Swiss-Prot record:
Keyword Nucleotide-binding among record annotations: yes
Name this polypeptide is given: Endonuclease MutS2
Top-level lineage group: Bacteria
Recorded name of the encoding gene: mutS2
Catalytic class of the enzyme: hydrolase
Organism the protein comes from: Staphylococcus aureus (strain MRSA252)
Family classification: Belongs to the DNA mismatch repair MutS family. MutS2 subfamily.
Binding site for ATP: G336, P337, N338, T339, G340, G341, K342, T343
SMART domains: MUTSac, MUTSd, SMR
């Protein structure tokens, strides 16, 4: 895109806004290189890239990029054998630290909100290399200013010697300066440094009292800085140690530089990605400051900018206007008063397109649509050149000639006051001819003019639409509102009347203008009134639609709350009912258990299937808490006699003996034969019958509720206890009595320890006097 166009549209000021938001020289470099793209895919990618980071920036607090700096020069120097200093290594360390912090932040962000995807940013995060080892090597070796003492064993030893020698020098010099005899001979009782040597300030007249080397003197010459002979050798030793220290530091820095060179490619990738992120975040910050939104780019030629405003004007006072090239409209001609905002409208359109194609969000409401232009051509403002001795008209015409040579169907052309600066009739004719030529080329055109002839131009051409900037006759000032589809009209008579000009003069003037022009002005006035009425109705309609949407949202939320409340009430009712049924079921289980025991002990006539059926009636009253709890039988092939089935209501397996009819079947469940609904049966796959082995066993007799272990040996007693507890559990006993006698207490202790570990025992206690006292332990079974 032409630099001249960017200059006229003041794109450099937009770049300055973005540059002010960058953190690093990397981001600033990207801003300086920022130019509008002209390839459709590139433009879309750049906008998506900015929008992704803007979404994150508007919702979250981004990690700091402070300290990020360009390090590629250091990396290249390391690669060719140079040695980096501590400051340069720290900048590389900070690059790694910043990229790690941002990657951690992004990973946490994605984990917290899995539904949101950032494909472009995700790709950038995947590009960031792992440089943990290099970071640790630098971090453990030096701080911001110098190498750590423990950077190497040799460096630690050298610095330790320097420290101890310095301490001895200080002690020696302290004795001299604190000596009572020397107080009057010293300018000050301090130890200072000159030429990297420890010295004391001696008055010039007492020079002969101090043996040593004079390293410096005061400006007045009254103070000499003397290194006493007693510390000369120690200072020499420090100089040698400093030299050794420098050699060791050089060795360590060379080693660290080698590590940097080994990771040069990864570091350059990290620098490139983080620089781009700084650039994108700066775009996001700038976009938020102008309340920018993301436009939709279309392949077909489109311009729709709802409530667009110029981003360089004061946001509080600027008037936002909708700029739109409606379907089949290729040329828009704006008429209206001077200083009414026509030129600002042109610049707003041109600058927004340049911004959008540079990957910047644009100052419009949501829903803007744009196509991608290969070039934007402008003839805006007074570009008169004094040096070239060109008039205003000549200057504009020179620019227009160049535009007409280069413009094509992929161009946007902006003409400000087309044909101005010459005879009105000739200027209007030239303007119409130029517009016809540009329309023939196929460019999209927006032009401003004050020629009345151009108001009728759109009515004689297809694809041309009039527009105007509104003028308030009451306040005698422009409103800066753009009226699409309405041509501007002359307000001279109204303004003159407002200013107090005689009505006789005004009326006579009206008779002097042509009938056609008068009718045109009346038509335009009518159009303006209709436009305002329609615009008012549209605004009212928009308000009503928003209110309706709000009411709809409120009602939807209330309905959802009602449904949740209703569901909660039903669930609570089911829960309470289930609790009551559960209590009744437990009571029934206890009764059935007692009846079984009674049958086993006394042979009572109790029918098993009657007990199960009674309990099933309680189970039928259970309410499922959720769909997942509703058991639905699986549909298999048709059930026939001989099939193995599961009886869903009892949870038991059985065999179908006979199909009574389409709805019922006779099923054998163990020793019970029942007629059941077929829908209560679930067909099972027959298991392969394994050959059975005949095992003879004795009939199990009913066991007692007590076990007498008296007379048993310790080990035998515990074996007998285990067997007894198993039988007691099978007999559904809740409590049994273990008789172990008193004796030495060893058997009692062993029994109780065994009961404590047994899986079927929930509790035990010593016997009451009526139960046998200490000779008995009472165990409660699970």
């Amino acid at each position: 895109m032409r630099q001249k166009t960017l200059d006229v549209l003041e794109f450099d000021k937009i770049k300055s806004l973005v540059a002010n938001e960058t953190i690093s020289d990397l981001g600033l470099e990207k801003v300086n290189q920022m130019m509008p793209a002209t390839n459709f895919e590139t433009v879309v990618f750049q906008m998506e890239e900015t929008d992704e980071i803007a979404q994150i920036y508007n919702k979250h607090r981004l990690p700091s990029l402070s300290g990020l700096s360009k390090v590629s020069a250091f990396i290249h120097r390391a690669d060719i054998g140079g040695v980096l200093n501590v400051s340069e290594l720290n900048l590389i360390k900070r690059l790694i630290q910043v990229q790690n912090q941002f990657k951690t932040f992004y990973n946490q962000l994605v984990e917290e909100d899995e539904g949101v995807k950032y494909p472009i940013l995700d790709d950038k995060m995947n590009q960031l290399p792992v440089l943990t080892d290099l970071f640790q090597q630098i971090n453990e070796t030096c701080d911001t200013y110098d190498l750590y003492d423990n950077a190497s064993y040799e460096l630690q030893g050298i610095r330790s010697k320097i420290s101890s020698t310095n301490q001895r020098i200080r002690q020696n010099l302290d004795r001299i300066v604190k000596s009572q005899a020397n107080q009057k001979k010293l300018s000050d009782a301090i130890v200072t440094v000159r030429n990297e040597r420890n010295v004391i300030p001696v008055k010039a007249e007492y020079r002969q009292d101090f043996n040593g080397i004079v390293h410096d003197q005061s400006a007045s010459g009254q103070t000499l800085y003397i290194e006493p002979s007693s510390v000369v050798e120690m200072n020499n030793q420090i100089s040698r140690l400093r030299h050794d220290e420098a050699i060791e530091k050089e060795r360590i820095l060379t080693q660290l530089t080698g590590y940097v060179a080994a990771d040069k490619d990864a570091l350059l990738v990290a620098e490139q990605v983080m620089g781009q992120l700084d650039f994108l975040i700066a775009k996001a910050r700038c976009s938020r400051s102008i309340k920018g939104t993301k436009p939709i780019f279309k392949e077909e030629r489109t311009v729709y900018l709802p409530k667009a405003y110029h981003p360089l004007l004061n946001r509080e006072t600027v008037v936002a206007n909708t700029i739109e090239f409606m379907e089949d409209i290729e040329t828009v001609i704006i008429t209206g008063p001077n200083t009414g905002g026509k030129t600002v409208t042109l610049k707003t359109l041109g600058l927004i397109i340049v911004m959008a194609q540079s990957g910047l969000l644009i100052p419009t409401l949501d829903g803007s649509q744009l196509s991608v232009f290969k070039n934007v051509y402008c003839d805006i403002g007074d570009e008169q050149s004094i040096e070239q001795s060109l008039s205003t008209f000549s200057s504009h015409m020179t620019n227009i000639v160049e535009i007409l040579k280069n413009a094509d169907k992929h161009s946007l052309v902006l003409f400000d006051e087309l044909g101005a600066g010459t005879d009105p009739s000739e200027g209007a004719a030239l303007a119409m001819s130029i517009l016809d030529h540009v329309r023939k080329i196929g460019s999209l055109v927006m032009a401003t003019t004050h020629y009345p002839e151009l108001k009728a131009y759109s009515y004689n051409r297809e694809g041309v639409m009039n527009a105007s900037v509104e003028f308030d006759v009451d306040t005698l000032s422009p409103t800066y509102k753009l009226l699409m589809g309405v041509p501007g009209r002359s307000n001279a008579f109204d303004i003159s009347k407002k200013l107090g000009l005689s009505l006789n003069i005004i009326n006579k003037a009206k008779t002097m203008i042509g009938t056609d022009e008068k009718e045109i002005n009346e038509m335009i006035e009518s159009l303006e009134r209709n436009y305002k009425r329609v615009e008012t109705q549209r605004l009212e309609l928009d308000r009503l639609v928003k209110e309706a949407e709000q009411v709809h949202d409120d009602l939807s939320k209330q309905y959802q709350q009602f449904q949740n409340y209703e569901k909660s009430l039903i669930e609570d009712a089911k829960e309470k009912a289930n609790q009551k049924i559960k209590a009744a079921t437990k009571e029934a289980d206890d009764i059935i258990k007692d009846l079984r025991q009674l049958r086993e002990q006394k042979g009572a006539d109790v029918k098993e299937h009657e007990l199960i059926d009674k309990k099933k009636r309680l189970d039928d009253h259970y309410e499922a808490k959720s769909i997942k709890q509703n058991v639905q039988k699986q549909k298999y092939d048709k059930i026939v006699a001989g099939d193995e089935v599961k009886v869903l209501s009892y949870g038991q397996k059985g065999e179908v003996l006979e199909i009574v009819n389409d709805e019922e079947a006779i099923v054998q469940m163990g020793i019970i034969k029942m007629k059941l609904p077929i829908e209560d049966l679930e067909k099972k796959q027959k298991e392969k019958v394994k050959p059975t082995k005949m095992v003879t066993r004795q009939n199990r007799q009913t066991i007692k509720t007590e076990l007498d272990l008296r007379g048993y040996r310790y080990e035998d007693a515990l074996i007998e206890l285990d067997q007894y507890l198993d039988q007691a559990v099978l007999s559904n006993y809740e409590q049994v009595y273990i008789i172990h006698g008193k004796g030495t207490g060893a058997l009692q202790k062993g029994v109780q320890q065994h009961l404590k570990k047994h899986k079927s025992v929930s509790d035990f206690r010593g016997g009451m006097p009526s139960e046998g006292g200490f000779g008995v332990t009472v165990a409660t079974l699970k």
